[in-house]
Amino acid sequence: MKKNDLENLKKYVGNIKEYSDIIDEYPIKAMSALLDRDYVYKKDLIVPEGWHWLYFLETPQQNQLGPDGHKKREGFIPPVKLPRRMHAGGTMMFYSPIILGDKIKKVSKIQNIELKTGSTGNLIFLTIQHAFYKEKKKLLVETQNIVFREEKKSSKNKTSLQPTVEKFKYEKIWDPSAEMLFRYSALTFNTHRIHYDYPYATKIEGYENIVVHGPLLATFVLDLVNKVAKVEGKKLFSLSYRVNIPVFVGGKIKVQGIDDIEGFKFWIKDSKGKTALSAKVVFTN
């Protein structure tokens, strides 16, 4: 990547886009079904943390989609020339709950664009901050990290990460399936082909199977975190997480956690025992 290319991308820092949405019932009901939860309507229902991803959805027309299924990079998102895109992690700070029926405003801002070099070549890291408000009351601030990378240089995407075993106090096991990923893609109007198109994911992008969405992995973590909060008599304030490697369908994964001198830590072990996601959690009393 040329120096001028990066300088042109940095001109997008500070870009702002605003959205509004009404927190209606169907996405909550459907997400409950996806996670095998019973859903019972009640007035002033609190939307679980992480489920804000079911709202404020982009709706690009078919002719606006790129070869990978993502919307072509124009407008708010910088036109990064690197072809591959992945959700790399983020931070969420929860100030006040989102309630069923609320009218919410979302303000998104390009915070940073950074060039790095990794084992696959050039990487562009894009940081976007999303702030959510009910009228003037701040409810949630999310910092989203997206990584763009070059085309694969071999037939398969490989990682040097080795399986490890850690002590844990909390655990929940999930078995992501193609049906689950299809449902989550539909719920979030996500057309990224690595999540549902097996030939594309394996032959074009070099993955071993279709890839579990980064936000869905974070949702699995939040599911366990909220159970821990109830047991410990605490309230979730923030979650910071990083996706280390892709997670694929075709094997059970373990969400695990522990509280030690450094605080509450959670992680996801993929079906091979590798730490696919690492997270830190802050609770309040």
What role is predicted for each listed range?
Residues 1-103:
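Hydrophobic, proline/glycine-rich low-complexity stretches
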Residues 2-46, 160-217, 224-227:
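A contiguous, surface-exposed recognition patch within enzymatic or periplasmic domains that forms
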Residues 2-17, 87-176, 243-285:
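HotDog/MaoC-like acyl-thioester-processing domains
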Residues 13, 23, 27, 57-60, ...:
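Solvent-exposed, flexible loop/coil residues
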Residues 45, 122, 233-235:
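Short, surface-exposed helix-loop/turn micro-motifs enriched in polar/charged residues
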Residues 79, 130, 134, 210-211:
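Alpha-helix boundary/capping detector
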Residues 201-262, 269-276:
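Catalytic-pocket segment enriched in acidic/His residues
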